[in-house]
């Protein structure tokens, strides 16, 4: 599948092992490269649902500005945020913040939005995906166990849906499960397919 993309060098601009795993599931050849360091800042007035797409674009621009884009490069960048009560929960700085985030999510429904940017030297395509996730009530003991065993400090909202906490606490997901993991692969596949057919 996606034979039209074989002329491109597909690069996943992300250090995330979850995004690497998900992109691998599309059976396309790619390489994973760490992105240049960027401050994940965004304009204060920006709609919260638009933040991940803004950051995905920033990551692509950082890659481009370092002269890392060749004519054959097809770069995929992404960013995922958790939103609850109009507040973005990013990656926790420490255990205390992670526990606070999980207590906030406990017994409630929150939104997960992933923004994805596909960049070629002369073209950029961007899209986002939103899912709703409902948590069961989490006890302090369950939160402590999860943080001790899984240390989710590299994850937005302090949890990985594919981990232990997902098995015991996720009551419902409305929308893409893989979006919650960090990459809406069904949309990405269609965008890559369309890109290959039109270029």
Curated annotation (Swiss-Prot):
It holds the Pfam family Maf. InterPro entries: ITPase-like_fam, Maf-like. Disulfide bonds: none annotated. It is found in: Cytoplasm. Its EC number is 3.6.1.9. It is an enzyme of class 3 (hydrolase). This is dTTP/UTP pyrophosphatase. It comes from Porphyromonas gingivalis (strain ATCC BAA-308 / W83).
């Amino acid at each position: 599948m996606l034979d039209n993309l074989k002329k491109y060098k597909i690069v996943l601009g992300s250090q995330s092992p979850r995004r690497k795993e998900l992109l691998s599931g599309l059976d396309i050849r790619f390489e994973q490269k760490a992105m240049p360091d960027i401050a994940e800042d965004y304009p204060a007035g920006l709609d919260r649902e638009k933040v991940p797409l803004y950051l995905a674009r920033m990551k692509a621009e950082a890659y481009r500005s370092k002269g890392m884009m060749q004519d054959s490069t097809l770069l995929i960048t992404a960013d995922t945020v958790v939103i609850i009560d109009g507040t973005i929960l990013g990656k926790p700085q420490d255990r205390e913040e992670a526990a606070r985030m999980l207590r906030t999510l406990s017994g409630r429904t929150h939104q997960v939005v992933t923004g994805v940017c596909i960049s070629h030297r002369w073209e950029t395509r961007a899209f986002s995906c939103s899912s709703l996730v409902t948590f069961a009530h989490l006890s302090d003991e369950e939160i402590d166990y999860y943080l001790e065993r899984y240390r989710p400090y590299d994850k937005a909202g302090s949890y990985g849906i594919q981990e232990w906490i997902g098995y015991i606490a996720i009551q419902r997901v409305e929308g893409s499960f893989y979006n919650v993991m960090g990459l809406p692969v069904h949309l990405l596949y269609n965008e890559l397919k369309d890109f290959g057919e039109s270029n």
